């Protein structure tokens, strides 16, 4: 168990270094720091692009801390995957730091479905198992880039592009990813298109996808 724990910590350190690189200078999508830190003041009613700062004298070590990435997420769902997010909502000290982390667990044949991060580049590394990953570039080419990742492999999903990860192995898989924003956002393509509230008209979707409306209605019913 000690060896497994040490290995996990080493892998976590690698991802942390990648996260720092990802958030450095102009590469980060968030504004640069103007002070040492700006811990979120959760009691403030001020609304800004980001979050207001807590008084520095009230900041404690716990504002920069999160525990739980060693714990596997529950993958008993339709997609067979689970994302554990560590961004500014979990660590208020990440405010203005331009970086966050996620742990993604995958059951065999588990999928993190096609989605985008509108405010961040993502750099995942596989901790256990193997993953088939890919992203699609913008119009008009819509070219698909794919790769099979094994333990220790790293890949890059450029900011804003649709991407996915699929566990193509027979065992559980785990990945840890750094993102270049304190609040990357996520838009899951299927949920956005077929599960919006209120729903997008089936006439519009039928024309967009060049299928009958009854097919659109059946798909929307799944969301």
Swiss-Prot record:
Disulfide bonds join 38-53. Pfam families: Cupin_1 (PF00190). InterPro entries: Cupin_1, Germin, Germin_Mn-BS, RmlC-like_jellyroll, RmlC_Cupin_sf. Keywords: Apoplast, Disulfide bond, Glycoprotein, Manganese, Metal-binding, Secreted, Signal. Mn(2+) binds at residues 115, 117, 122, 163. Residues 67-217 form the Cupin type-1 domain. Glycans are attached at residues 74, 82, 168. Residues 1-28 form the signal peptide. It is found in: Secreted, Extracellular space, Apoplast. GO terms for molecular function: manganese ion binding. GO terms for cellular component: apoplast. It comes from the Eukaryota. PANTHER family: GERMIN-LIKE PROTEIN SUBFAMILY 3 MEMBER 3. Belongs to the germin family. Oligomer (believed to be a pentamer but probably hexamer). This is Putative germin-like protein 2-2.
